[in-house]
Amino acid sequence: MNYWDTACVLKLYTAEPDSATYLTLAGQAAEPLLASEILATELTYALYQKELRGALKTGSVERVLKQFQADCDAGRWLLLPLGRDVAIRAAQVATACYQRRPPIAVRTLDGVHLATALLAKATHLVTTDERMRQAARALGMTLTP
């Protein structure tokens, strides 16, 4: 199963230059797409930021969020809970990344996503974030694309 980072999920719901690649990848999935339940919150913030920058038509946020919720309700997404196990694993991710030489400056929410993906035993991580990709490689994860 593919675990999806928020930036790549955004490409599924808003037009970006490389959206077609991610729509194809999501469309090929035989099982639900994996993400942390924090995705819904991050997606909301990201959509409003796009709207403020003029990259999303004013008033579109609610429509996009309704579509995302409909996809969740239809079983397209499996949103994994943020529990103590994720917090513990995220701290381990931080230790593994920051103690490397050179260190990988993974951000907090990226660490939460990496921890969630590891706990879910996701087969691939879908992300475009270079720091997150470096951390994932260091943790032995397979990247897509």
Model-derived regions, located:
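Active-site-proximal, substrate-binding regions of enzyme catalytic domains
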Residues: 38-97
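Active-site neighborhoods of divalent-metal-dependent phosphate/nucleic-acid chemistry enzymes
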Residues: 77-130
